[in-house]
Regions:
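Boundary/entry segment of secreted carbohydrate-active catalytic domains
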Residues: 1-11, 146
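Metal-dependent enolase-superfamily TIM-barrel catalytic cores that perform enediolate-based chemistry
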Residues: 141-145, 149-153, 159
């Protein structure tokens, strides 16, 4: 099962040809793919039409805070670190449920969230407020509630970047972190 990213905001002939030939299991959207509610609906519908036998996984990084790919028409959520400071699994569930409902409304069925790293290294350039906090118990409770809020509303959750990325001092987008 492959999941691919692509450039552009529409299903072009080249993209359609590639998807038809390669038959990926899914696509992931980034900011470069998303302009408006209607454009996202048109894009997801167009992509799904290319995969009539097996619905595509259509994924996004919609964590809240600085990792939010949807345009401004959607609800803006705080980073997970702020939710963690509230220490309310009910709030985490509710936020995730709302995110899921908005994603489903435009045809997105998978969220590359939540971040399940424990923010144990203040020098980490990537995790920071993307984590629910520095206590494993808090991260577990809030992460579990977030997964429930997404999945109870028909959006697949994908926990990340474990194991231990929160304890590194390396940007994993630039080099491979090592956890001792």
């Amino acid at each position: 099962l492959f999941m691919i990213g692509f450039t552009g905001t529409t299903v072009t002939k080249d993209l359609a040809s590639f998807l038809t030939a390669s038959k990926p299991g899914g696509v992931i959207f980034f900011r470069r793919n998303l302009e408006s509610v209607q454009q996202i609906v048109d894009l997801t519908n167009g992509l799904q039409k290319l995969s009539p036998a097996q619905p595509l996984l259509i994924a996004i990084d919609q964590e809240g805070g600085r990792v939010s790919r949807l345009p401004a028409e959607f609800t803006i959520f705080p980073p997970c670190g702020q939710l963690g400071q509230c220490n309310s699994s009910e709030l985490a569930y509710s936020a995730a449920a709302t995110i899921a409902k908005e994603l489903r409304a435009v045809g997105i069925n998978m969220n590359m969230a939540p971040v399940l790293d424990v923010n144990s290294n203040p020098d980490n350039p990537v995790i920071g407020d993307r984590a629910f906090g520095a206590a494993p118990e808090l991260v577990g409770e809030m992460g579990s509630a977030t997964i429930g809020g997404l999945q109870d509303n028909m959006v697949i959750a994908c926990g990340k970047h474990f194991p231990g990325h929160g304890d590194t001092a390396t940007d994993s987008h630039r080099e491979l972190p090592v956890v001792d």
